[in-house]
Amino acid sequence: HKDGNRERGVDLLGSLKRVGLDLCPVFCSGSDPTAQRREQWSDGANAFALAPGVFVAYARNERTLAELGRHGYRSVQPEEFIRNASYFIDGGDKVVVALKGSELVRGRGGPRCLTLPLARLASAPRKSGS
C-alpha cells in the first residue's frame, strides 16, 4: 500500500466518523473475548435484515442477544413476529427475531446464509466485448 495504510492500519469506525457516519457497533457476545469466539463459531454475528432495525438471528447466542438488548433491541420469538409483522416492521422499534435451532449452525450457516432472493431486478444486457 503506497499510502501507508497497511503499516499503520485503518480504523474503519474512525474513518466513517470523519465522513459524517458515526456508528455505534454492537459486538458479537459483548466485550468478553472468550464468549465472542464461542458465539462467533455458532454464527452470532450472522443475521438477516427484514427491514431497517429488524433482523433475524439465532436465539442460541444468548450473550449476543443480551448485548443487542443493551443497545435497545427487543428480542421476539418468530411466532410473535409473524402474528404482528406489520407492527414490528412499520413501528420503528429495533427488533431481533430470535430463531431457535442448533442443527443449522452445524453446517456453518446462519440466517443470512440460509436465504435466497425470491425476486430479482432485471439487469441490463451486457455489451459485447465486456
Ranges and model annotations:
Residues H1-S130:
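Histidine/cysteine-enriched polar flanking segments
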